[in-house]
Amino acid sequence: MRTILVVDDDAWVRGLARDVLAREGYRVLEASDGQDAIRVSAEHPGPLHLLLTDVMMPGMNGCDLAAGLSALLPGLKVMFMSAYDRDFLVARGLNPVGPVITKPFTIEYLTRRVQMVLGDRRAAAPVATAAPAR
C-alpha cells in the first residue's frame, strides 16, 4: 500500500483529500503545516511515496517543505496544490518543482493526478481540466 502525506492548513481540504485517496486504497497521513509534516514523516515507520502539499501556508511554504523532505527521503514524489496558478506563484518567489493542481479541483481530477504522479496504471485516461469540487 502506498503512503501519501497530505499537508494543507485548511482542514477541509486535508479531510477531502484524505477521504478520496483512502477510498482509492492509499494510506493517508495528514499534517496542518510544514513543521507538522516533518514531525509526521519522522514518526511514520514506513516509506512515504508522495507528498501532496499546499504551496502557500503559514510558516514553512510547500516548496521549502518539499525540498527538505526530498533531501531526507530520496525518491519521494511531490505534487502541489494551490489556489493560485504557477505563474502567480513564481512571480511571488515560489517555484514548485513538480505538478501543481489548482484549487478548487474535482475529486476525479485529484485522483487521476495522484495516480499519474505515482505511475499507477489506473490513470490511463487523461483528465482534461480541473473544476470546483465544492
Each language-model region and where it sits:
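Active-site beta3 strand of CheY-like receiver
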Residues: 45-52
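Active-site residues of response regulator receiver
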Residues: 54, 82
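Short hydrophobic/Thr-rich beta-strand motif most characteristic of the beta2 strand and flanking loop
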Residues: 25-32, 40
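Acidic catalytic/metal-coordinating carboxylates
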Residues: 32-36, 61-65
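C-terminal output helix
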Residues: 105-118, 122
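Receiver (REC) domain active-site loop signature in two-component systems and cognate sites
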Residues: 57
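Charged docking surfaces used in two-component/phosphorelay signaling
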Residues: 15-23
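Conserved acidic carboxylate
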Residues: 8
